[in-house]
Amino acid sequence: MTENGGTAAGPVISVRDLSTGYGGNPVVHDLSFDVKAGEVLCLLGPNGAGKTTTMLALAGELPLLTGEVEFAGVGGKAPLFKRARNGLSYVTEERSVFKAMTLRDNLRVGGVDPQEVIELFPELEQRMGTRGGLLSGGEQQMLTLGRALARKPRLLLADELSLGLAPLVVDRLLQAVRRSADEDGTAVIMVEQHAHKALRYTDHAIVIRRGRVGLDLTGEDARKRISEVEHAYLTSVDGNGASTPS
């Protein structure tokens, strides 16, 4: 067993034939993959393809309709708090920031040493006394991601880190994710719409189309076949040009 929950060859998280959705109605169908320690998997696709729905199921926030999820010995029906105890950190689309607290107190209330986050994002050092509500969107995301990574999770789920942020900030965030995988052995599953940037940091890419696997590629193959990956987005809508429910 490695420090981050898998064997030397085995996965940290294993997903088999996962179907999940809302009110008993499947949105995601028959999804299967493994993620090993130190590996970054990127789930790609347009709005409504089922990416966030998948993440909610992996975190234990949505029920599995069929299939299995195994993470650190915890099955797919375990809620988020039990998974967190086993080393899961989940960065959602909504940045989890206490707006009335300083950046420093936002970290301390989460049990994180601010210095560990400064090591990841040195630009935050001069902002430690600033209230969360006065931080820029990029600074808030650095706070949220830094807090998650400072806990040295076995598994990081990161949903749309790049949402609404400048390209340079997105690079800083994705570099921190890659560093955590490489140096700490964190297994990472991240959701992104913007393939070009995300694929620079990815070992494995899955394009979800209408709730199903459209493409399943190594990171290297996905980078070589970027036009095909992007074409998969364009064919992930219904006949009226609208995405399926997320």
Which residues make up each language-model segment?
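ABC ATPase NBD coupling module
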Residues: 63, 75-95, 126-129, 222-229
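Conserved ABC ATPase signature
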Residues: 131-135, 139
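ABC ATPase C-loop
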Residues: 148-149
